[in-house]
Amino acid sequence: MNDNISPIHSPYKAPNTISLVAGKGDTNNPLNAFDMALLDAGICNVNLIKISSIMPPKAEVVPLPDIPMGSLVPTAYGYKTSDIKGETVSAAVSVAIPKDKELCGLIMEYSAIGGKKETEDTVREMAKTGFEMRGWEIDKIISLASECTVENIGCAFAAVALWYK
């Protein structure tokens, strides 16, 4: 560790925006179905870095910004793939935003076999439970979900991308 940098003064700046995105894809293999879902969600051509589920304090919810190709993008995401024709898969994310703006928010992600309504209901309940466990008050919960009814190999994807304003 560099002795000149205190852990309190980390060289890494926390992102100050979050964006919810969701998409679906169906093609001839799981990886391309996932990639197609990223294309549909508008978050392709970047490197998603999977993170645990914390929204930095005071982060602003914004539409997905124009992120340079190849960027490393901190992202909490869920996805579900299937090769069973006619099966519906879904993925959802939610963000619980605290009343106390000095606190962090909670991002939850979930995926399942079934429709997006049930998956979105589940992920919203997960965010609520996370706040209850911490004893925090919720200002609001936002969420987004996708579903894909499989024809070949299908993928449903939902994410919260963290970025900088």
UniProtKB/Swiss-Prot annotation:
Site (Cleavage (non-hydrolytic)): S52, S53
Gene3D superfamilies membership: 3.30.60.30, Pyruvoyl-Dependent Histidine Decarboxylase, subunit B
Keyword Lipid biosynthesis: no
Any one GO MF annotation of this record: arginine decarboxylase activity
Stored InterPro entries: Pyr-dep_his/arg-deCO2ase, Pyr-dep_his/arg-deCO2ase_sand, Pyruvoyl-dep_arg_deCO2ase
Keyword Glycosyltransferase: no
Enzyme Commission identifier(s): 4.1.1.19
Pfam family name, one: PvlArgDC
Cofactor note: Binds 1 pyruvoyl group covalently per subunit.
Catalytic activity: L-arginine + H(+) = agmatine + CO2
Catalytic EC class: lyase
Similarity comment text for this entry: Belongs to the PdaD family.
Protein's name according to its UniProt entry: Pyruvoyl-dependent arginine decarboxylase
Species name: Methanococcus aeolicus (strain ATCC BAA-1280 / DSM 17508 / OCM 812 / Nankai-3)
Organism lineage: Archaea, Methanobacteriati, Methanobacteriota, Methanomada group, Methanococci
